[in-house]
Amino acid sequence: HSASSAASDVYKRQLLMVTNSSHAIAVEDAKFSAPEIHRGLWPHMVMAGLFRVMPKRAGLDFVMRGKPIDAMEAERLGLINKSVSKKDLDQTVSDLAKELSSLAPGTMQFGLEAYEKQDSMSFDEALPFLQKQIAKTFEGPDAKEGIAAFLEKRDPNWD
């Protein structure tokens, strides 16, 4: 999983990158578009990620009409996590990276892998799979350290 940031307008390959990132931050004046329909084309590759982050109707409207949306609308529809001023973009991305890297690294990786696996399962298949993952998480070193740190009222040491 990755984070992406957009300092300008986003379309085509950049849009694919944004839709496939776990976190996406854009400047407030960025525009997002999939204009292929205006050229007699369809954004087939973009759909792989688009419908995983945007509601179906909003995503279909976005690709069927090919009209750009602004960063506020992109945030409202779930295409991005947050829109910020141009001057705050680098600091916001840096703060996010710092926050994520300060969390339990083994558990983060394990959890993201479990997310990927269960994403293609039916609800009834996912529940027993995820129940097993909970047990494995509790057995891991991050859980042991996190619980000990909580009980000892200290910050965890993930090293």
Specify the residue positions occupied by each region the protein language model found.
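C-terminal long alpha-helix characteristic of the crotonase
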Residues: 25-30, 80-128, 135, 139-141, ...
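Key positions in alpha-helical "signaling/recognition" and NTPase switch elements
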Residues: 17-18, 74, 150
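A general structural signal for well-ordered alpha-helical segments in protein cores
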Residues: 43, 47, 56-59, 105-111, ...
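Short acidic/histidine-centered micro-motifs embedded in hydrophobic/aromatic stretches
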Residues: 65, 77, 110-117, 149, ...
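Single conserved hydrophobic/aromatic residue that forms the stacking wall/gate
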Residues: 1-7, 11
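Well-ordered beta-strand positions
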Residues: 22-23, 61, 65-67, 73, ...
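CoA-thioester-processing core
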Residues: 12-63, 92, 96
